[in-house]
């Protein structure tokens, strides 16, 4: 029996218990694989994602997002991963590539040792969450391919239970551009509105002139006055809003708890929430958490965060950055266990390199392919 078949038959049980756990057109990988069979070989390269529309956020505007694509090769199989780096994460192409360049995954001969590999990455550097997420995603893709199963099946999740995903719009000063964004969200059952830029009511009123579709709000830490934040929550509740994400700066936890006690809408932790210990810290100040792979260091910890939040009686939202279908489809593997999804990052870019997650009548549909479920586009 060859190594791949041996792993597929003998390690499946272990994997079920462990974590209820040239590839691009942008040029040659930075570290081309050259190792022998039976060892993990890491390669990576930077790229730039181009946004279909400018994002006008609470603190900045952006038209592109940098990223780094990752692949891990093992015994003839390739696992794909991705690091996306919006400015507030504090990571850059330089920091990610420097971190990845320090890793020596050839010391590992078993790709299922994801916990050990995370411990090794933490020993190399304590931060670098997006960089670690790219490796974690690639490992999950690889191990799922070895087992011949997508991760939602390995976790025992029902793909019929995936939620609707929201589609994101943000304020545009040009009325024609604003209307174009509103028109594009028509096929979706939920719309996420980016707020905190000084035109908060205008964007909702523009949407409500043509649609009563439920909205969720991402305030992007844009409301620093608790009275104003509470007033906005009441105003939004009258306009078919489901919840408000990160209404106040993340360090204003007492003020956020004050708003949460009085708000008619659930308050969701976003920028406040990074890693597993933050879930317990969010309990009491927030009603729900928004898990993103780039903040949680990947799928391994994201699963644990969702389980803990549910045990604490909190709701769970699954989000993403502006990413290709690689990272978004990886996140979608978790979607049957969450209450809300905001998995539209791949729909907001003009140069996706992967085929993966599909949105059918507004609902997340997970591919049945092994691993994270993506295929590299030609």
Regions found by a protein language model. Give the residues of each.
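Conserved, mostly hydrophobic/aromatic
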Residues: 70, 76, 135, 148, ...
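C-terminal segment of N-terminal export signals and the immediately downstream linker at the start
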Residues: 21-56, 63, 73
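Metal- or metallocofactor-binding catalytic centers and their adjacent structured scaffolds
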Residues: 36-44, 73, 78-146
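N-terminal export signals
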Residues: 5-27
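Metal-dependent enolase-superfamily TIM-barrel catalytic cores that perform enediolate-based chemistry
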Residues: 151-263
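Flexible C-terminal active-site loop/helix
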Residues: 13, 35-49, 67, 75, ...
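Catalytic alpha/beta core domains of metabolic enzymes, predominantly
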Residues: 251-256, 262, 266-268, 272-343
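N-terminal secretory signal peptides
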Residues: 1-2
């Amino acid at each position: 029996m060859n190594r791949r078949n041996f792993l597929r038959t003998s390690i499946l049980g272990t994997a079920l218990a462990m974590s209820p756990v040239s590839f691009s057109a942008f040029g040659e990988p930075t570290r081309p694989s050259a190792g022998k069979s039976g060892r993990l070989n890491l390669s990576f390269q930077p790229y730039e994602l181009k946004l279909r529309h400018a994002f006008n956020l609470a603190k900045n505007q952006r038209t592109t997002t940098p990223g780094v694509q990752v692949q891990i090769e093992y015994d003839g199989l390739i696992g794909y991963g991705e690091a996306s780096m919006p400015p507030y994460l504090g990571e850059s192409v330089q920091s990610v590539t420097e971190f990845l360049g320090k890793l020596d995954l050839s010391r590992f001969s078993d790709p299922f040792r994801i916990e050990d590999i995370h411990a090794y990455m933490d020993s190399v550097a304590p931060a670098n969450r997006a960089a670690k997420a790219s490796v974690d995603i690639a490992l999950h893709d690889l191990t799922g391919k070895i087992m011949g199963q997508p991760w939602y099946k390995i976790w025992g999740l029902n793909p019929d239970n995936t939620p609707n995903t929201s589609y994101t719009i943000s304020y545009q000063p040009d009325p024609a551009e604003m209307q174009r964004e509103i028109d594009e969200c028509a096929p979706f059952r939920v719309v996420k509105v980016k707020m905190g830029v000084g035109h908060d009511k205008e964007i909702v009123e523009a949407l409500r002139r043509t649609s009563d579709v439920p909205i969720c709000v991402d305030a992007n830490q844009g409301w620093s006055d608790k009275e104003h934040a509470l007033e906005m929550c009441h105003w939004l509740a009258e306009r078919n809003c489901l919840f408000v994400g990160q209404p106040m700066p993340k360090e204003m936890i007492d003020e956020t708890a004050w708003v949460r006690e009085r708000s008619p809408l659930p308050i969701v932790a976003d920028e406040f929430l990074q890693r597993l210990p933050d879930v317990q810290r969010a309990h009491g100040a927030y009603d729900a958490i928004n898990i993103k792979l780039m903040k949680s260091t990947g799928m391994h910890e994201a699963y644990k965060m969702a389980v803990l939040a549910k045990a604490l009686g909190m709701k769970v939202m699954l989000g993403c950055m502006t990413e290709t279908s690689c990272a978004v489809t990886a996140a979608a593997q978790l979607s049957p266990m969450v209450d809300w999804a905001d998995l539209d990052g791949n729909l907001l870019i003009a140069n996706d390199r992967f085929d993966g997650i599909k949105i059918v009548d507004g609902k997340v549909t997970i591919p049945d392919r092994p691993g994270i479920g993506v295929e590299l586009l030609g």
